[in-house]
Amino acid sequence: MSKKVLITSRSFGKISNEPLDILTGAGFEVTMKGKDFDQAEFEAMIPDYDALIIGAHEFPEAVMERCPKLKIICKHGAGLDNIHLEKAKELGIAVCNVPGTNSNAVADLTFGLMLAVARNIVSTNRWVHEGRWQTAIGVDVCG
Protein backbone atom coordinates (compact mmCIF):
# COMPACT_ATOMS: atom_id res chain seq x y z
CA MET A 1 0.00 0.00 0.00
CA SER A 2 1.44 3.36 -1.01
CA LYS A 3 1.87 6.28 1.32
CA LYS A 4 -0.55 9.16 0.79
CA VAL A 5 0.57 12.79 0.56
CA LEU A 6 -1.85 15.72 0.75
CA ILE A 7 -0.63 18.98 -0.79
CA THR A 8 -2.55 22.11 0.21
CA SER A 9 -0.06 24.72 -0.98
CA ARG A 10 -1.52 26.64 -3.93
CA SER A 11 1.91 27.22 -5.45
CA PHE A 12 3.43 23.74 -5.08
CA GLY A 13 4.33 22.38 -8.52
CA LYS A 14 3.13 25.50 -10.35
CA ILE A 15 6.45 26.37 -12.00
CA SER A 16 7.59 22.81 -12.63
CA ASN A 17 6.10 19.33 -12.41
CA GLU A 18 9.41 17.99 -11.10
CA PRO A 19 8.40 17.98 -7.40
CA LEU A 20 5.24 16.01 -8.20
CA ASP A 21 7.15 13.64 -10.48
CA ILE A 22 9.64 12.95 -7.69
CA LEU A 23 6.85 12.12 -5.24
CA THR A 24 4.89 9.91 -7.63
CA GLY A 25 8.11 8.29 -8.89
CA ALA A 26 8.93 7.34 -5.30
CA GLY A 27 5.57 5.58 -5.03
CA PHE A 28 3.58 8.21 -3.16
CA GLU A 29 -0.11 8.68 -3.87
CA VAL A 30 -0.41 12.46 -4.23
CA THR A 31 -3.55 14.55 -3.77
CA MET A 32 -3.34 18.21 -4.80
CA LYS A 33 -5.92 20.41 -3.07
CA GLY A 34 -4.52 23.92 -3.23
CA LYS A 35 -7.10 25.93 -5.13
CA ASP A 36 -10.60 26.52 -3.77
CA PHE A 37 -9.79 24.46 -0.71
CA ASP A 38 -11.41 25.51 2.52
CA GLN A 39 -10.47 24.79 6.11
CA ALA A 40 -13.41 22.46 6.78
CA GLU A 41 -12.55 20.27 3.79
CA PHE A 42 -8.91 20.17 4.91
CA GLU A 43 -9.85 19.10 8.44
CA ALA A 44 -12.10 16.34 7.09
CA MET A 45 -9.47 14.94 4.70
CA ILE A 46 -6.20 15.09 6.62
CA PRO A 47 -6.70 12.06 8.95
CA ASP A 48 -6.32 9.73 5.93
CA TYR A 49 -2.84 10.97 4.96
CA ASP A 50 0.70 9.95 5.90
CA ALA A 51 2.33 13.23 4.87
CA LEU A 52 1.24 16.82 4.40
CA ILE A 53 2.78 19.59 2.32
CA ILE A 54 0.95 22.58 3.71
CA GLY A 55 0.61 26.12 2.51
CA ALA A 56 -1.27 28.74 4.51
CA HIS A 57 -4.02 26.52 5.95
CA GLU A 58 -4.24 26.46 9.71
CA PHE A 59 -3.43 23.10 11.27
CA PRO A 60 -4.94 23.32 14.76
CA GLU A 61 -3.86 21.14 17.63
CA ALA A 62 -7.26 19.40 17.83
CA VAL A 63 -7.12 18.40 14.16
CA MET A 64 -3.56 17.11 14.51
CA GLU A 65 -4.72 14.80 17.29
CA ARG A 66 -7.13 13.15 14.84
CA CYS A 67 -4.33 12.19 12.41
CA PRO A 68 -2.93 8.83 13.56
CA LYS A 69 -1.26 8.10 10.20
CA LEU A 70 0.47 11.47 9.82
CA LYS A 71 4.27 11.20 10.06
CA ILE A 72 5.54 14.46 8.52
CA ILE A 73 4.36 17.99 7.82
CA CYS A 74 6.37 20.06 5.38
CA LYS A 75 5.57 23.76 5.15
CA HIS A 76 5.86 24.92 1.54
CA GLY A 77 7.33 28.23 2.64
CA ALA A 78 9.42 29.67 5.41
CA GLY A 79 7.10 30.37 8.35
CA LEU A 80 5.69 27.71 10.62
CA ASP A 81 3.13 29.85 12.44
CA ASN A 82 0.14 27.87 11.09
CA ILE A 83 1.42 24.58 12.55
CA HIS A 84 1.23 23.74 16.26
CA LEU A 85 4.87 22.65 16.70
CA GLU A 86 4.64 21.45 20.30
CA LYS A 87 1.68 19.21 19.52
CA ALA A 88 3.46 17.80 16.46
CA LYS A 89 6.50 16.97 18.60
CA GLU A 90 4.31 15.37 21.26
CA LEU A 91 2.62 13.20 18.60
CA GLY A 92 5.92 12.24 16.95
CA ILE A 93 5.16 14.12 13.74
CA ALA A 94 8.25 15.55 12.04
CA VAL A 95 7.92 19.16 10.84
CA CYS A 96 10.11 20.84 8.25
CA ASN A 97 10.06 23.96 6.11
CA VAL A 98 12.11 25.58 3.37
CA PRO A 99 13.57 28.75 4.89
CA GLY A 100 15.31 31.16 2.59
CA THR A 101 13.93 29.76 -0.65
CA ASN A 102 11.89 32.88 -1.26
CA SER A 103 14.58 35.40 -0.28
CA ASN A 104 15.27 36.50 -3.87
CA ALA A 105 11.55 36.97 -4.54
CA VAL A 106 11.15 38.97 -1.32
CA ALA A 107 14.11 41.17 -2.27
CA ASP A 108 12.69 41.70 -5.77
CA LEU A 109 9.29 42.68 -4.41
CA THR A 110 10.83 44.98 -1.81
CA PHE A 111 12.86 46.76 -4.45
CA GLY A 112 9.81 47.03 -6.71
CA LEU A 113 7.75 48.55 -3.90
CA MET A 114 10.56 51.01 -3.10
CA LEU A 115 10.58 52.15 -6.74
CA ALA A 116 6.79 52.40 -6.80
CA VAL A 117 6.82 54.68 -3.75
CA ALA A 118 9.82 56.73 -4.86
CA ARG A 119 8.39 57.34 -8.34
CA ASN A 120 4.67 57.61 -7.41
CA ILE A 121 3.87 54.79 -9.82
CA VAL A 122 0.53 53.85 -8.24
CA SER A 123 -0.79 57.41 -8.27
CA THR A 124 0.37 58.17 -11.80
CA ASN A 125 -1.08 54.89 -13.08
CA ARG A 126 -4.44 55.79 -11.54
CA TRP A 127 -4.32 59.27 -13.08
CA VAL A 128 -3.64 57.88 -16.55
CA HIS A 129 -6.56 55.47 -16.22
CA GLU A 130 -8.75 58.40 -15.16
CA GLY A 131 -7.74 60.27 -18.32
CA ARG A 132 -5.53 62.77 -16.50
CA TRP A 133 -1.95 63.40 -17.43
CA GLN A 134 -0.11 65.10 -14.64
CA THR A 135 3.45 65.08 -13.53
CA ALA A 136 4.41 63.56 -10.23
CA ILE A 137 7.83 64.42 -8.94
CA GLY A 138 9.58 61.43 -7.47
CA VAL A 139 12.88 60.91 -5.78
CA ASP A 140 15.96 58.97 -6.80
CA VAL A 141 16.61 55.62 -5.23
CA CYS A 142 20.31 55.36 -4.61
CA GLY A 143 22.82 54.47 -1.98
Tell where the protein language model's regions lie, with residue ranges.
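Phosphate-binding beta-alpha-beta segment of Rossmann-like dinucleotide-binding domains, i.e.
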Residues: L91, P99-G143
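An N-terminal-biased, well-structured beta-alpha scaffold segment characteristic
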Residues: M1-C96
